[in-house]
C-alpha cells in the first residue's frame, strides 16, 4: 500500500439534492488527473450492500466492505469523493471536506423532481435545516478542513469549484513532498515540550 500521497483527497458532501454530483462534474473537468468516486455508484458496482431499508426505499451500504475497497484507492491521493455520508472515511486520508448547503425551496424542487416520496423529502429537508451533514463533518474531521459552501445555482457551483481548485493549488504548494497515509497518533506532552524549546 502507498505510504505517501502527493495529491489531496476531497470529499464533496451534503444533503441529497444539494448539488454534489453536479459540483463534482464541474470539479473533475478542472482537476483532470483526479479520480472521481460517486459512492452510491461505487457501492452498487462493487456490491457493497448489506440489505435494503423498506421504509426509506434505499439500500443499506456495508461501510466496512466499502472502506476495504476504497481505502487503497484513497491512499493514492488525487481523489474526489461524492457522498452524503462523510464520517466513514479515515481522517488521515482526507484533506478537505466540502459541505454543500441548499435553500430548502430549491432542495424540495430537486428532490420532488427526482421522484422522492414525501417522507424522504421531509427527512432530507429536516437534515438540511438542522445542518446534520455539517455537524457530522465537524465531529469526524478536524474543523479547519471542513468548509461550508452555498449551492443553490449553477453560478454558486462554478464559484465553489473555483475555490476548491484554488485550495488544491495551495495544498500542493504546501506539501511538495506529499503527506503520509499512516496514522500518526496524538502528540504527546513530551513532543509539545520539545517543540517549545
From Swiss-Prot:
Enzyme type, top EC level: transferase
EC number(s) reported in the record: 2.7.4.3
Region annotation LID: where it falls in the sequence: 113-123
Effect of substituting residue 21 to G: Sensitive to hydrogen peroxide
UniProt main location, coarse: cytoplasm
Modified sites of kind Phosphoserine: 188, 196
Annotated localization: Cytoplasm; Nucleus
Keyword Nucleotidyltransferase carried by entry: no
One BP term from GO: maturation of SSU-rRNA from tricistronic rRNA transcript (SSU-rRNA, 5.8S rRNA, LSU-rRNA)
Annotated Pfam families: AAA_18
Molecular function as annotated in GO: adenylate kinase activity; ATP binding; ATP hydrolysis activity
Residues modified as Phosphotyrosine: 183
Annotated phenotype, changing residue 82 to A: Decreases the processing of 20S rRNA
Keywords, ordered alphabetically: ATP-binding, Cytoplasm, Kinase, Nucleotide-binding, Nucleus, Phosphoprotein, Ribosome biogenesis, rRNA processing, Transferase
GO terms under cellular component: cytoplasm; cytoplasmic stress granule; nucleus
Catalytic reaction equation(s): AMP + ATP = 2 ADP; ATP + H2O = ADP + phosphate + H(+)
PANTHER family: ADENYLATE KINASE ISOENZYME 6, POS9-ACTIVATING FACTOR FAP7-RELATED
Miscellaneous section: Present with 8350 molecules/cell in log phase SD medium.
Known function: Broad-specificity nucleoside monophosphate (NMP) kinase that catalyzes the reversible transfer of the terminal phosphate group between nucleoside triphosphates and monophosphates. Also has ATPase activity. Involved in the late cytoplasmic maturation steps of the 40S ribosomal particles, specifically 18S rRNA maturation. Required for cleavage of the 20S pre-rRNA at site D in the cytoplasm. While NMP activity is not required for ribosome maturation, ATPase activity is. Associates transiently with small ribosomal subunit protein uS11. ATP hydrolysis breaks the interaction with uS11.
Family: Belongs to the adenylate kinase family. AK6 subfamily.
Summary of subunit composition and partner proteins: Interacts with small ribosomal subunit protein uS11B/RPS14B. Not a structural component of 43S pre-ribosomes, but transiently interacts with them by binding to uS11/RPS14.
Protein name: Adenylate kinase isoenzyme 6 homolog FAP7
Amino acid at each position: 500500500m502507498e505510504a505517501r500521497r502527493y495529491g489531496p483527497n476531497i470529499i464533496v458532501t451534503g444533503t441529497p439534492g444539494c448539488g454534489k454530483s453536479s459540483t463534482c462534474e464541474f470539479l473533475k473537468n478542472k482537476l483532470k488527473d483526479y479520480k472521481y468516486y460517486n459512492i452510491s455508484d461505487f457501492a452498487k458496482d462493487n456490491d457493497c450492500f448489506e440489505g435494503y431499508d423498506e421504509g426509506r426505499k434505499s439500500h443499506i451500504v456495508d461501510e466496512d466492505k466499502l472502506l476495504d475497497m476504497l481505502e487503497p484507492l484513497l491512499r493514492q491521493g488525487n481523489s474526489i469523493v461524492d457522498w452524503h455520508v462523510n464520517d466513514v472515511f479515515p481522517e488521515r486520508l482526507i484533506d478537505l471536506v466540502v459541505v454543500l448547503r441548499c435553500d430548502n425551496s430549491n432542495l424540495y424542487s430537486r428532490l420532488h423532481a427526482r421522484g422522492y416520496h414525501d417522507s424522504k423529502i421531509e427527512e432530507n429537508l429536516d437534515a438540511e435545516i438542522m445542518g446534520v451533514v455539517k455537524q457530522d463533518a465537524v465531529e469526524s474531521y478536524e474543523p479547519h478542513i471542513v468548509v461550508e459552501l452555498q449551492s443553490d445555482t449553477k453560478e454558486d457551483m462554478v464559484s465553489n469549484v473555483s475555490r476548491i481548485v484554488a485550495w488544491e493549488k495551495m495544498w500542493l504548494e504546501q506539501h511538495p513532498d506529499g503527506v503520509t497515509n499512516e496514522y500518526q497518533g496524538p502528540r504527546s506532552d513530551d513532543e509539545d515540550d520539545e517543540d517549545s524549546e
